[in-house]
Each structure stands twice: as structure tokens, then as C-alpha cells.
């Protein structure tokens, strides 16, 4: 198998923190590329909503991401079609996403279904037969244009115009669980995040 001609910078910090002698094992002829982001948004024709989607995409491009943005008219309106679309994007190294963002709740005007009843994580099972995600996925859970407008206002406040000297909340975090029994894995995840957070910021 030929070595890759490029590496995504999305996971560089993770790899360098987990792999011994990471810098020495890299192919020196390969280059790092900016992260790829796949945005799938609910197919809703409201002009304000679409302008806010474009605003989000433009902002991510300004931050250096390679962005592919499609509506569910292209990606599909059911979980199987959406998973197949993501898989096709992943199988092509020129479009393979590092991150996926779904814009739309599972109900409402711009609905996008979850992969099963509760979660989107299965959308990220794209390589191999294991149960580990191969990309990072998130969802902007909005049901109306007003909610999307409010979300973009928060992005402007937190990412574009933030006053770091006054942002003491950056030293805090909240871990959210669910009301059902999720097994021991959630407890391990909380402990892992807690330990690594203390390593970064002991205070």
C-alpha cells in the first residue's frame, strides 16, 4: 500500500499526544492539509434559513476548512440514504470529511433523521468492521429559522467577537448524560475527559 500523499491536520494533535515518536514516523514528503467539513442541512426553502446556512459555511471556510455543503435533497431524506451519501464522500480521498455537521433537528422545518432512534454516531462508522467512528459528527439541532438565526448569533459572539479576558466560562465545562441506562462507558468517558482537562488546566 502506497503511503498517503497528504495528512489531514484535523487529528494531528490527537495523534501526536497518543503515538510514541509520532514526528519520526511521518512521511516527510507528505503534506498536511486543512480539515474537511461536510455540512448536510435540512431541505427548507426559507430565504433567511438558507442565508444563515451560507453564513455558517462561509465562516468555516474563513477559518480554513474545506467545506462541502448539501441539503437533504442531495444527501437523502432517510437515514440509509444519508449514510450512503456520507460513505461515498468518505470513500473518495479528495472529499473524505474529518467532520460532519448536520443542520436541523430530527423534527421541524429542516428535519434530518438520526441514524437510529437516539443518535447520529452510527453515521460515522465508515471504515472497517469495528464500532468506532472514523469522523467526528455534530448536529445543530434547530427546528425553525428563528432558532437558526439565534444559533448564528451565538457563533458570532463566541467565535468571532469573543473577549478572552472576560471569558472565564472557558475554564468550566458540563458533561451531559441521558435519562436511560447507558452502561459503564459513559462513566469511563466522563473520567477520561475529567483527567485530561485537569492535565491541561489544573486550576
Describe the predicted segments one by one.
Residues 1-203:
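Cysteine-dependent hydrolase recognition
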Amino acid at each position: 500500500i502506497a503511503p498517503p500523499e497528504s495528512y489531514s491536520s484535523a487529528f494531528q494533535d490527537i495523534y501526536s499526544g497518543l503515538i510514541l515518536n509520532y514526528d519520526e514516523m511521518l512521511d516527510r514528503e507528505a503534506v498536511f492539509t486543512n480539515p474537511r467539513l461536510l455540512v448536510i442541512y435540512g431541505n427548507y426553502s426559507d430565504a433567511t434559513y438558507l442565508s444563515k446556512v451560507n453564513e455558517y459555511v462561509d465562516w468555516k471556510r474563513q477559518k480554513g476548512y474545506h467545506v462541502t455543503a448539501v441539503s437533504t435533497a442531495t444527501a437523502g431524506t432517510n437515514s440509509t440514504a444519508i449514510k450512503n451519501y456520507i460513505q461515498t464522500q468518505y470513500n473518495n480521498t479528495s472529499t473524505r470529511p474529518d467532520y460532519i455537521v448536520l443542520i436541523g433537528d430530527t423534527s421541524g422545518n429542516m428535519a434530518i433523521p438520526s441514524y437510529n432512534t437516539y443518535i447520529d454516531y452510527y453515521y460515522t462508522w465508515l471504515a472497517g468492521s469495528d464500532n468506532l467512528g472514523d469522523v467526528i459528527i455534530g448536529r445543530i439541532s434547530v427546528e425553525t429559522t428563528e432558532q437558526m438565526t439565534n444559533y448564528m448569533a451565538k457563533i458570532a459572539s463566541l467565535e468571532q467577537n469573543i473577549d478572552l479576558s472576560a471569558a472565564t466560562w472557558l475554564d468550566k465545562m458540563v458533561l451531559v448524560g441521558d435519562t436511560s441506562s447507558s452502561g459503564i462507558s459513559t462513566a469511563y468517558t466522563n473520567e477520561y475527559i475529567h483527567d485530561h482537562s485537569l492535565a491541561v488546566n489544573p486550576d
